[in-house]
Amino acid sequence: MSNNYTSLSSSLDEEMGLKAGHEIDLEGSPPSEHNSEEKSTLPSNSDILTSANPVSQASETPDHSIESNTGSTQSPTSHSLLLKFSFCIVYYSYFAIVVLGCVLPFEHTHTFLIAFLVIFGIISVILFSGSIYYYETWTKTVKHFLKKVISPFKKEYIVCAFLKTFVFYGLLKTIEHFLVLLSGDKWGWKCSTLSSILTPVSCISFCLNESVQLRSCSTHLFINTVAWIKSLGGGKNAFENNYNQLNETSPEDLV
């Protein structure tokens, strides 16, 4: 039986193969790099998918260390709860003593005292529970405020603020003493509670004054006095140098 096979390559294909530098062999075997032996070395589809998406398998396995760390940070310790509770008790005990000290020494009706104690008890419970609930918030706020206020200070400014508070407290106690001698214990209770309230308020006010208005009159006098005392051993030139150095410093240099 004669073979009627005709080649699929035409004269045009042969010319194109000669121009390209190689001849297209349509009758031969496939190229060597695509034989069946090397097909087995190619990675499978599952290997390609796992190598392309390694995060999905890692995310499926739970990390117990992360869960334990988050659980430990979210659950408050007994030490912090005890500190929070005791601090709020001390703070509102002081508040209750001051408020009750302003009201109880005077003559009031029985109905007024009952109404006052009920209203005061409700307000105290609300403030006490709110202070415990927002303990971390307002303590962080106070720390941030004190850091911003005290950081640009030198020691002289802090000492001046507390000296002003001490003088103010001494003035209140002197007035209280004279009022007790003149009119009895009635005005003594008033001035005592007033001094208990105004002392921390005045301390905060003086510190704010020193932070907003640096080198107020009394602070400037105090710093010049300290510079004069330090310059006693060095003579007049040392005093002038210290005075000029203090006047030339800006608030930005105090940080």
UniProtKB/Swiss-Prot annotation:
Which of UniProt's keywords are assigned here?
Membrane, Transmembrane, Transmembrane helix
Question: Which Gene Ontology terms of cellular component type are present?
Answer: cytoplasm; membrane
Q: Which residue ranges traverse the bilayer?
A: 85-105, 112-132, 162-182, 187-208
Give the GO biological process terms. Answer: meiotic drive
Composition-biased stretches (Polar residues):
41-60, 67-78
Per the record, membrane topology reads: Multi-pass membrane protein
Give the disruption phenotype, in one or two sentences. Answer: Simultaneous knockout of wtf14 results in normal vegetative cell population growth. Simultaneous knockout of wtf14, wtf11 and wtf7 results in normal spore viability.
Whether Transmembrane helix counts among this entry's keywords is yes
- List the coiled-coil residues: none
Q: What else is known?
A: Although the gene is capable of encoding two isoforms, RNA sequencing data show no evidence of alternative transcripts.
Record function comment: May act in meiotic drive.
Instruction: Indicate what this protein is called per its UniProt record.
Output: Wtf element wtf15
